[in-house]
Regions:
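A short glycine-rich, Lys/Arg-flanked "PGG" loop and its adjoining helix->strand segment in the class I
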Residues: 131-146
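Core SAM-dependent methyltransferase catalytic element
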Residues: 199, 214-230
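Short alpha-helix
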Residues: 183-200
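A short SAM/SAH-binding and catalytic strip from SAM-dependent methyltransferases
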Residues: 117-131
Length: 230
């Protein structure tokens, strides 16, 4: 999750936070957060340094910090509102969970050769120019470190993903409720493969995971993994 001077994530997750304050027992990569692969695809995280890029309220990061024995999980998000929710919900998990308020590009640019694993669940990879973000992510990973992320396989209205690295303007709300837009990158499989290769990654894999629901605004998920070149 990324933001500009106006926090366009101010409202996101607030209702859930009012009634669900527990560390999640599950971790899903799917758009509807129900089924599909789980944290096992991250590999053994014991003693590893992990980062969640665009962590929102840090629910996925809290799950990993609690159940998978990493040395540290950094939950990084630029939104003041999401940062505040994450601190409120999971601040007690420090120091294993480190909640960081920062733009993701700015953060990873200061963390060269730090992370064993970086991941994003419909987070910063969706809302940041990949040609700017992904080279910085590669530098923040240790040689051989892994990037894993889930992203939309198509637009929520059903339109196909983009063949080029171009964003679309999608609906958003300002903190006072006014309608606005933000940029989101919804790219085809081969487009992600190309931009990852150009950004310093190898062993690139892109899998399309079908939606497990027929609810309105459901979507298939692209699950992408890549390794930083040594």
């Amino acid at each position: 999750v990324t933001t500009t001077t106006t926090d366009l994530w101010h409202h996101y997750g607030r209702i859930r936070t009012e009634h669900d304050r527990a560390v999640p027992h599950t971790f899903s990569w799917l758009w509807n957060q129900n089924g599909g692969p789980g944290p096992e695809v991250l590999g053994d995280l014991t003693g590893k340094v992990v980062g969640d890029l665009g962590a929102g309220a840090a629910r996925h990061a809290a799950h990993l910090a609690t159940h998978h024995a990493p040395a540290r999980v950094d939950a990084v998000d630029a939104s003041p509102a999401q940062y505040a929710m994450a601190i409120d919900l999971f601040g007690h998990l420090a120091p294993r969970l480190r909640i960081v308020r920062s733009g993701v590009v700015k953060h990873v640019q200061t963390m060269a050769d730090t992370y064993d694993v970086l991941y994003s669940v419909f987070g910063a990879v969706d809302f940041t120019d990949p040609s700017e973000l992904l080279p910085s992510v590669a530098v923040a990973l240790r040689p051989g470190g892994r990037l894993l992320f889930s992203t939309l396989a198509h637009y929520l209205g059903g339109a196909p993903a983009e063949p080029d690295v171009v964003p679309a303007d999608v609906p958003a709300r300002t903190p006072n409720g006014e309608a606005t837009t933000m940029r989101r990158w919804v790219l085809q499989e081969q487009t992600w493969t190309k931009v990852l290769d150009e950004s310093g990654f190898t062993q690139i894999s892109v899998d399309r995971l079908p939606s497990t629901t027929s609810a309105p605004r459901s979507a298939d998920t692209l699950f992408v993994t890549a390794v930083r070149r040594a």
